[in-house]
Regions:
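Mid-domain alpha/beta scaffold segments of enzyme catalytic cores
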Residues: 1-283
Length: 283
């Protein structure tokens, strides 16, 4: 096996978005987790993005307690599957403490894999779910997706103003105006390996300087978005949580901070946002 150059970081990292239910991990999922541990990734949030995979995310979280946690939701690409039955299934999933956020949900007008009216309906229903979930104690956070749908996205979120818990706009790749609109709402920002892409991510290198440390989190979005700074590039092109440190390294360079400072702040922010147990309590 070819050795991959991965930055060494002492602080235990948290990957807030890894699609570990993806079938590309079916043959070596345990090895993927072992490599993540070896690269300093102590906890991972497994993204639930459709009706079929959200229950699988929960099963993974239950299989690896304290290390894996889950979200449950329906990505806009799958919006047409959000029926009454699906809504009931999602609400049942959110009764489990291992499910720590509502989503991935939102709007995607870039690819339009689902009709836009269906996307808006599914998003609205999941916002209602989020408004209902966690009462009377604490509302669960939202794990949000937005591509080329900023105006509708903001309008729909505004309709639920004051009724939702904290929110993170995952895999942020947008404009300065979008970033500041999100920060003005006190939302969090998830940064992926898009930042490491010299072809399409260079604008982010200036924008990440403006994200307060207590609003910034990191994610691989594995198996997608393999950082282009990984050397050598694996032939299979599959991203894994083990590569999370490459995002930390680029963030540190762009923000003028040390790698350890970025690692510590993003882990502390993720722990608070998802209400995770302290790292020392993780098994």
């Amino acid at each position: 096996m070819t050795l991959i150059d991965t930055p060494l970081i002492e602080t235990s990292l948290i990957d807030i978005g890894a699609n570990l239910t993806h079938d590309s991990f079916d043959h070596d999922r345990e090895a993927v987790l072992q490599r993540a541990r070896g690269a300093g990734v102590g906890r991972m949030i497994v993204t639930g993005a459709c009706r079929a995979h959200s229950p699988r995310a929960l099963i993974l979280a239950q299989t690896y307690p304290g290390e894996l946690f889950a979200t449950a939701g329906v990505h806009p690409h799958h919006a047409t599957e959000y029926t009454d039955e699906c809504d009931a299934e999602m609400r049942a999933l959110h009764a489990h403490p291992e499910v720590v956020a509502v989503g991935e949900c939102g709007l995607d007008y870039n690819r339009d894999f689902s009709p836009r009216p269906a996307q808006r309906k599914a998003f609205e229903r999941q916002l209602q779910l989020a408004a209902d979930t966690g009462k009377p104690h604490a509302l669960k956070p939202l794990f949000l997706h937005q591509r080329d749908a900023h105006e509708d996205f903001m309008a729909m979120m505004k309709n639920f103003d004051g009724r939702l818990g904290p929110a993170v706009v995952h895999c942020f790749t947008g404009t300065r105006e979008e970033l500041f609109a999100y920060l003005d709402q006190d939302w969090h920002i998830g940064i992926t390996g898009w930042l490491c892409d010299e072809r399409r991510g260079t604008h982010l290198r200036e924008l990440v300087k403006h994200i307060p440390a207590n609003r910034l989190m990191i994610e691989t979005d594995a198996p997608y978005l393999l950082p282009r700074t990984v050397r050598p590039q694996p032939s299979h092109r599959r991203n894994e949580p083990m590569y999370l440190a490459h995002i930390v390294e680029e963030l540190a360079r762009d923000r003028g901070e040390t790698v350890e400072a970025v690692a510590a702040s993003t882990s502390a922010t993720a722990t608070a946002f998802f209400r995770l147990p302290p790292a020392a309590a993780a098994t």
